[in-house]
Amino acid sequence: VEDVIFKNNTVNGVVVNWTPVLREGMHVDPLNILAKIVVDGTGHDSEIAATVARKNGIRLATETGGVIGERSLDVVAGEDEVVNGTKEIYPGLYVCGMAASAVSGTPRMGPIFGGMLMSGKKVADEIIAKLKK
């Protein structure tokens, strides 16, 4: 994902390109993929959330309005807080997993991954509930 589709102050999809095009510097238009919901599960860099905030001058649902950045490792706190940070951070954009930790400024978690599974389940459940409305 190199960008998002942003219309009416809502994230409406993603803009993607493929590696050979980028590697060879080919002048090929990227693909636009429309979506009712976009999930940033890009990990420690939270690339989609960072792009949305940077390019559109908006405030995310965080203490600072931007991507706070993950804190140093604390396995116990990280396991709980990755689930708590899993949420919709801007209309049409959810975060889960380590992207949720990076966006919310919570600790990374180390080698125990129960929180990652619970984060994935939570984001799926929230999206299903939203789409049913």
List PLM regions with ranges.
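Residues forming the flavin
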Residues: V1-K133
